[in-house]
């Protein structure tokens, strides 16, 4: 049995559909976050898609789904600090990004963006007087895009899991930015210690992350750790028995 793994859809539902339809023998798919379009829309894939949140999502809709409202067809959100059965595999999730100023906040206390709070009062739609805020500005303002310590600790206590899904990468995760005229390429460690802590505690058979829009393979304390590129470029097919994976170009 094969399972598909994708990352950073960002509303490119055509690319997601193309990947799924290319492999009719793959019954289940997983995603490491950033599913929504810029307008906050979500897909209805033809196969079940188990996903964690990224930092670019419709957080009002996620809050509603976490409160019990039904998700679109075949979408299955794995909440932070929980695990789900994906076929024969136990898959844990820690979505969103790290922000030191919000890390000690309770997840329930992370504030919504200003535009989100306004829409909660007014209802959805283009009502006159709605705030003139771009979708990107709103997402940056919405602190629900982050994970917090209580969710990290919940993840660490989940016990044996086969696959850990995170949006952020573990540390070290060295990136070299594209060179600019007159400037040296900037080399930085974009990994997060909190993700490393979860990896060390859980020791999953496989770790998958995204966020950085590139394909990078590493081994961390014996655990294969793969950053999946965004869906318009590639995705993974994973053997559910061995967790051996293949990168598939779009």
List each language-model region with its residue ranges.
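A short helix->loop->beta-strand "cap" motif at the edges of active sites that frequently abuts
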Residues: 45-48, 202-205, 223-224
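Active-site-proximal loop/helix segment associated with metal-binding centers of metalloenzymes
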Residues: 89-186
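Proline-aspartate-enriched helix->loop->beta-strand connector
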Residues: 161-170, 195, 199-209
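Core catalytic region of metal-dependent phosphoesterases/phosphodiesterases
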Residues: 2, 6-86, 189, 228
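Active-site-proximal beta-strand elements of phosphoester/diester hydrolases
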Residues: 2-10, 88-97, 163-167, 224-229
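Binuclear metal-dependent phosphoesterase catalytic core
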Residues: 62-64, 84-87, 196-201, 213-250
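Catalytic-core regions built around general acid/base machinery
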Residues: 41-46, 193-201
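Catalytic metal-binding/acid-base residues of hydrolase active sites
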Residues: 10, 35-36, 55-57, 83, ...
């Amino acid at each position: 049995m094969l399972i598909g793994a994708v990352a950073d859809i960002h509303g490119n539902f055509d690319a997601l559909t193309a990947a799924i339809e290319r492999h009719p023998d793959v019954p289940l798919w997983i995603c490491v976050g950033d599913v929504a379009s810029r307008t906050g829309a979500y897909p209805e894939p033809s196969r079940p898609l188990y996903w964690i949140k990224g930092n670019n999502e419709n957080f009002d809709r996620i809050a509603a789904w976490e409160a019990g409202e039904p998700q679109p067809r075949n979408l299955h959100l794995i909440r932070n600090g929980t695990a789900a059965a994906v076929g024969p595999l136990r898959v844990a999730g820690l979505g969103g990004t790290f922000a030191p100023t919000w890390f000690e906040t309770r997840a329930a206390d992370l504030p919504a963006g200003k535009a989100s709070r306004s829409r909660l009062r007014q209802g959805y739609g283009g009502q006159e007087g709605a705030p003139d805020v771009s979708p990107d500005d709103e997402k940056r303002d919405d602190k629900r895009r982050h994970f917090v310590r209580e969710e990290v600790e919940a993840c660490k206590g989940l016990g044996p899991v086969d696959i850990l899904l995170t949006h952020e990468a573990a540390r070290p995760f060295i990136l070299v930015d594209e060179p600019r005229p007159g400037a040296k390429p900037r080399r930085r460690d974009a990994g997060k210690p909190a993700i490393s802590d979860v990896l060390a505690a859980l020791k999953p058979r496989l770790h998958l992350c995204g966020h950085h829009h590139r394909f990078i393979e590493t081994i961390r304390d014996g655990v294969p750790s793969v950053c999946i590129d965004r869906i318009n470029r590639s995705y993974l097919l994973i053997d559910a028995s061995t967790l051996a994976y293949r990168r598939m170009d779009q």
